[in-house]
Swiss-Prot record:
<feature type="glycosylation site" description="N-linked (GlcNAc...) asparagine">
    <location>
        <position position="300"/>
    </location>
</feature>
<feature type="glycosylation site" description="N-linked (GlcNAc...) asparagine">
    <location>
        <position position="189"/>
    </location>
</feature>
<dbReference type="InterPro" id="IPR019794">
    <property type="entry name" value="Peroxidases_AS"/>
</dbReference>
<keyword id="KW-0575">Peroxidase</keyword>
<dbReference type="GO" id="GO:0006979">
    <property type="term" value="P:response to oxidative stress"/>
</dbReference>
<dbReference type="GO" id="GO:0042744">
    <property type="term" value="P:hydrogen peroxide catabolic process"/>
</dbReference>
<dbReference type="InterPro" id="IPR010255">
    <property type="entry name" value="Haem_peroxidase_sf"/>
</dbReference>
<feature type="glycosylation site" description="N-linked (GlcNAc...) asparagine">
    <location>
        <position position="203"/>
    </location>
</feature>
<feature type="disulfide bond">
    <location>
        <begin position="102"/>
        <end position="107"/>
    </location>
</feature>
<feature type="glycosylation site" description="N-linked (GlcNAc...) asparagine">
    <location>
        <position position="261"/>
    </location>
</feature>
<dbReference type="InterPro" id="IPR000823">
    <property type="entry name" value="Peroxidase_pln"/>
</dbReference>
<feature type="disulfide bond">
    <location>
        <begin position="71"/>
        <end position="149"/>
    </location>
</feature>
<feature type="glycosylation site" description="N-linked (GlcNAc...) asparagine">
    <location>
        <position position="118"/>
    </location>
</feature>
<keyword id="KW-0349">Heme</keyword>
<feature type="active site" description="Proton acceptor">
    <location>
        <position position="100"/>
    </location>
</feature>
<feature type="binding site">
    <location>
        <position position="198"/>
    </location>
    <ligand>
        <name>substrate</name>
    </ligand>
</feature>
<feature type="binding site">
    <location>
        <position position="101"/>
    </location>
    <ligand>
        <name>Ca(2+) 1</name>
    </ligand>
</feature>
């Protein structure tokens, strides 16, 4: 009996810690005045499974919603971790793929739809063509979730959100809260991809307007641009002078002109495999790679944000996580037909 009481006390302590962490995140997100999100340590995040505690107590596996959701989180994380371990660059690609989905008519998985004889999707837009990647990782993660969590339908839009969060975790050993419940659009918006996505040649005014249209202020715009602390840009993009910060033209390691199929890559900052503050350090020095990057130094508000994140990695990670949570909850456009796709690249 004493042994059982001791085990029960320990288990309840674990549950109390988990609920305290969840409450902290929920209270932070719901506060109308919040500017920062307290990051969740990786040992106490969305993969915490109540079934572990119940099993420890001898009550068997739980069939509750928490356990079902965590099955999905675990199934997606397994694939994402393996993909990034095999190729670090894939982490940046998955964050970008989620961004490019959500910024066109909300987080609806529209970017994943392939063209057909009767349908032209978003993948051929200039911002996406020969640029966004990671589709096969999303497909694998979706199949893994379908196989291991058959009782919990998960949308492709959900998989994108989870994959981006897990990429952030893989880079930083920090995480943030993602909930399930998104649905997939039965259509995509090529025109929207051409007009709503930020472009490397956008000046500060245009960038500000595009982010404001999605409900983001300039500080949030700057912190989301900080995703350029990881990943690469293609020489095919950089050889177009309007895309490149001209301060970098003399040292650009590309052979220009470059064809659309050119495979040359340049790191978006000096440490493209590390989620750090070097991106912001480069902006302050006038050495941002893209024209749109360096434009963030053109107003008092954006300069203040850039300097904030240059000086404090913790503030960068916290604010980035909060902005990603906000972005991951951008709703689909009104009137769009929704479903949960069986295969992410085509409608049911």
């Amino acid at each position: 009996m004493a042994s059982f009481v001791a085990r029960l006390t320990l288990a309840l302590s674990f549950i109390a810690l988990a609920l305290a962490g969840y409450s902290l995140v929920q209270n932070t997100l719901s506060s109308p005045t919040h500017t920062r999100l307290n990051l969740i340590p990786t040992w106490l995040d969305s993969t915490f499974d109540s079934a572990d505690v119940l099993s420890y107590l001898g009550f068997g596996k739980s069939s509750g919603r928490l356990s079902d959701s965590n099955c999905v989180f675990s199934a997606v994380k397994e694939i994402v971790d393996a993909a990034i371990t095999a190729e670090t660059r894939m982490g940046a690609s998955l964050i970008r793929l989620h961004f490019h989905d959500c910024f066109v008519d909300g987080c609806d998985g529209g970017i994943l739809l392939n063209d057909t004889a009767n349908f032209t999707g978003e993948q051929g837009a200039p911002a996406n063509s020969n640029s966004v990647r990671g589709f096969s990782v999303i497909d694998q993660a979706k199949r893994n979730a379908q196989t291991k969590c058959a009782d919990t339908p998960v949308s492709c839009a959900d998989v994108l959100a989870i994959a981006a969060r897990d990429a952030f975790r893989k880079f930083t050993n920090q995480t943030y809260n993602i909930t399930l419940g998104r649905q997939d659009a039965r259509t995509a918006n090529l025109t929207g991809a051409n007009t709503q996505l930020p472009a490397p040649f956008d000046n500060l005014s245009i960038q500000t307007a595009k982010f404001a249209d999605k409900g983001f202020n300039q500080r949030e715009m700057v912190v989301l641009a900080g995703a350029h602390t990881v990943g690469f840009s293609r020489c095919a993009v950089l050889c177009t002078s309007t895309n490149l910060n001209q301060n970098r033209s003399a040292t650009l390691q590309c052979t220009c002109p470059a064809s659309a199929n050119d495979t040359g890559l340049v790191g978006l900052d000096p440490s493209p495999g590390t989620f750090d503050k070097k991106y912001f350090e480069e902006l302050v020095k006038g050495q941002g790679l893209l024209f749109s990057d360096q434009e963030l130094m053109q107003s008092n508000a954006t300069v203040t944000a850039v300097r904030r994140y240059r000086d404090a990695t913790g503030a960068f990670l916290t604010d980035f996580a909060a902005a990603m949570v906000k972005m991951s909850n951008l709703p689909p456009s009104a009137g769009v037909q929704l479903e949960i796709r069986n295969v992410c690249s085509r409608v049911n």
